[in-house]
A protein has these predicted regions:
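Residue-level marker of regulatory loop/turn positions in helix-turn-helix DNA-binding domains and
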Residues: 33-34, 43
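General nucleic-acid-binding
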Residues: 1-18
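Recognition helix of helix-turn-helix DNA-binding domains
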Residues: 49-82
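Basic, Lys/Arg-enriched C-terminal extension of HTH/homeodomain DNA-binding domains
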Residues: 12-14, 28, 70-102
Length: 102
């Protein structure tokens, strides 16, 4: 398996974002009792943004962002970005099915 180049990663994240709405991220945060900062970090990871860029604009250190990410992952029960995306996709599909029933 070859690693993705930057263009492929960008295309993948753009495709991913079309399916993952802010509502789904909110559901995840509510379900797992994430803090506001943990919610923001999860959104950063899902968007494909880099902590370095966010730290520069947001005023939080990379270590702080990493700690918030680790805490969110522990609460959600995932151990890496891929597991997070799988979980968010699952939650998204579940939310879509529930919305279609109502």
């Amino acid at each position: 398996m070859t690693s993705l180049d930057n263009q492929q990663k960008t295309e993948y994240y753009e495709y991913s974002l079309k399916k993952i709405t802010p509502y789904v991220i909110f559901l995840c945060a509510k379900r797992h009792k994430l803090s506001q900062k943990e919610l923001e970090v999860i959104a950063i990871v899902i968007s494909g943004s880099r902590f370095k860029d966010i730290a520069r604009t947001d005023g939080r250190s990379i270590k702080t962002l990493s700690a918030q990410k680790r805490n969110a992952y522990l609460k959600i029960g995932v151990s890496n970005d891929v597991e997070l995306l799988h979980y968010i996709y699952w939650l998204s599909d579940k939310a879509i099915r529930v919305d279609n029933v109502n």
